[in-house]
């Protein structure tokens, strides 16, 4: 009973803390950017693969996630649309398994017309995300068909 009560209390505290974190202006702007990015059309003929460092990740409730990365040794930045939180969680990708500073390799496609989002981020859709050691974090081909 004590363990169950402690678990419930911890879940409540985490929920409260995440509400405060998501209410700041930067988080709201990132969530809005993720929603905009998830609605974009992507060009299957404009493939891109980057070896980059995670700058930020956004896990909105009702839209696809977004991972913002910075390419090492350059000024290139990308905002990659992923999938909804439940679909990513089924693959093991969450805010606990992918953190700012992590080095990853992302393969995907650019938005139609090479559109930018936010302050100069290349808009793209992630099809495959792996760690440097080859561990697969996200694979669009493994998402359930709609």
Model-derived regions, located:
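Conserved hydrophobic positions within beta-strands
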Residues: 52-54
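Short nucleic-acid-contacting surface segments enriched for D/E, G, S/T with interspersed K/R
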Residues: 89-106
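Short boundary/loop segments of OB/S1/cold-shock single-stranded nucleic-acid-binding domains
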Residues: 25-48
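Beta-strand/loop nucleic-acid-binding surfaces
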Residues: 78-94
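Bacterial N-terminal signal peptides
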Residues: 7-18
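OB-fold/S1-family single-stranded nucleic acid-binding modules
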Residues: 111-142
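Short aromatic-glycine-enriched beta-strand elements
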Residues: 60-70
């Amino acid at each position: 009973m004590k363990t169950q009560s402690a678990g419930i209390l911890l879940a409540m505290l985490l929920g409260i803390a995440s509400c405060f974190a998501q209410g700041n202006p930067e988080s709201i702007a990132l969530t809005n950017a993720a929603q905009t990015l998830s609605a974009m059309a992507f060009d299957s003929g404009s493939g891109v693969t980057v070896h980059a460092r995670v700058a930020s990740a956004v896990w909105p409730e009702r839209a696809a996630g977004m991972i913002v990365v910075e390419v090492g040794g350059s000024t290139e930045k990308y905002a990659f649309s992923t999938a909804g939180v439940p679909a990513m969680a089924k693959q093991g990708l969450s805010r606990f398994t992918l953190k700012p500073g992590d080095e990853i390799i992302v393969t995907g496609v650019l938005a139609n017309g090479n559109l930018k989002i936010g302050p100069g981020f290349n808009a793209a859709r992630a099809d495959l995300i792996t760690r440097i050691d080859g561990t697969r974090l996200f694979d669009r081909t493994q998402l359930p068909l709609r």
